[in-house]
Amino acid sequence: MASSSKDRIQGVLLSMPTINDEDHNLLLDRQRVHLRWLIDHGFKEGSGVLLIAGGMGEGYFLDDDEWRSLVDLLAGEARGKVATGVGIFELSARRAASKARYAADAGIDCVQMAPPHYLLPNEQEVFDHYRYVNDAADIGIVAYSTPWAMPSPGFEFSQRLLERFATLENMV
């Protein structure tokens, strides 16, 4: 990964809400206004990362076209002004890698990626999921711990797993 993208990931990672109408359709014009407001009022290069389609943005409910629309909006509005990120919530490492490549090609700096969550994965399966995406896409990866989203009792990143993540080139 180009170190310049990884170096841009500094400060607060702000997960933006996804703005919808009452029928759950994206309101991209309003999303754009919100994004511009954040940039105009203090989110600048080095002060933080603007994250779209993350947990707060209900990224796990978006279809692929909606997700791509938000990625394209963020990349277009924030390019050269502030670091950017996008949430990825996929059961399949292959689908997660495809989204990570799309985000990288759009100019996004990092993905905030949750582990696969339908079945309770073990530590090796979670590591393999992140390694697959790391090897497939040239983009920073932020590990997103979501133990509340797992089957009981939940999966939590261990110290050992975090140390293993640190061996992956693209992990932030």
State the predicted function of each range.
Residues 158-172:
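Active-site/ligand-binding-proximal alpha/beta "capping" segment
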Residues 2-156, 160-162:
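Active-site beta->alpha loop and helix N-cap motifs at the rims of alpha/beta catalytic domains
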